[in-house]
Amino acid sequence: MKKYYVRCKDSKGENASLVIEALSPEHAKEQAYEVYEVGDIYNVSLGEGKSKNCLDRKYSPYIKNDNGKAITIFS
């Protein structure tokens, strides 16, 4: 059995990360739905942070705080 990291939304509607020991990713999803009663599952991965399903920051603006001044930088 392997440890799978499951990123999901719990029954309260908050984002949650679960660590589930299962035989396969499908089995980990089944356990999350049945045992933990989650609402939505976003991602199932073997290692925490190894798979990414969010937008890359490469083309989005970010805020840099320089001496108390907020500067928005578009890259």
Swiss-Prot record:
This is SPbeta prophage-derived uncharacterized protein YorX. The gene is yorX.
